[in-house]
Design a protein with these regions (language model features):
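N-terminal single-pass transmembrane signal-anchor helix
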Residues: 2-3, 11-45
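Short, glycine/small-hydrophobic-rich surface segments
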Residues: 64-102
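Membrane-proximal N-terminal amphipathic helix
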Residues: 46-75
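Intrinsically disordered, low-complexity regions enriched in Pro/Ser/Thr/Gly and acidic residues
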Residues: 89-180
Length: 180
């Protein structure tokens, strides 16, 4: 066996791989794309939290509306009034997976961000915000929003005690902000 059979001729090299310059160019392109994508992905995460919170609030308002309609059909105004200060989560057939229950004297610092709980002392439903830098209002640090059921009165003539319904309202104003 000759050596010539083991090595290809010098003019026909089969080079596998790529050069260092090509590697640097690919890394620069990928880094640039990531630099553009990461802020957008972060904004989507904040938007997802906002939408999830609003979806739970919408579900609660619908459930409260159904209960109010039930009371109004039976002309049970005391039943409507009894909703004030009650736990809105009790109106749902299935509570969200991030609901921690009714807590007596809960310390918000001990509740994980992104969770709901009912503060039995304040008679308020509380959401602990995960993306605190994008949330203004509520009760400060840790960022949280509180809600309670309130009866709505309708003014007809001189009678201001006519019940029109009940709804879930924020106890303090809040807003989600963009950090652009």
């Amino acid at each position: 066996m000759t050596i010539a059979g083991k090595f290809p001729p010098t003019g026909c090299r089969n080079v596998a791989g790529f050069s260092l310059l090509e590697l640097v160019v690919v890394i620069c392109i990928i880094s640039g794309l990531l630099a553009l994508a990461i802020p957008k992905l972060w904004a989507l995460q904040v938007e997802a939290e906002k939408v999830a919170m609003e979806q739970v609030l919408g579900n609660l308002r619908s459930a409260i509306g159904i209960k109010v309609a039930d009371f109004l059909v039976r002309n049970d105004m005391a039943g409507v009034r009894s909703l004030t200060g009650s736990n809105p989560m009790d109106r749902l057939s299935e509570v969200p997976s991030n609901y921690r229950g009714a807590l007596n004297g809960a310390n918000p610092d001990t509740i994980a961000a992104g969770n709901w709980y009912f503060d039995m002392q304040a008679r308020a439903l509380v959401y602990r915000v995960r993306n605190q830098d994008y949330f203004r209002g509520g009760l400060g640090k840790p960022a949280r929003a509180r809600f309670a059921i309130r009866v709505i009165y309708e003014e007809r003539g001189r009678n201001t005690n006519e019940i029109a319904g009940a709804t879930l309202v924020p106890l303090e104003p809040y807003v989600w902000v963009d950090k652009d």
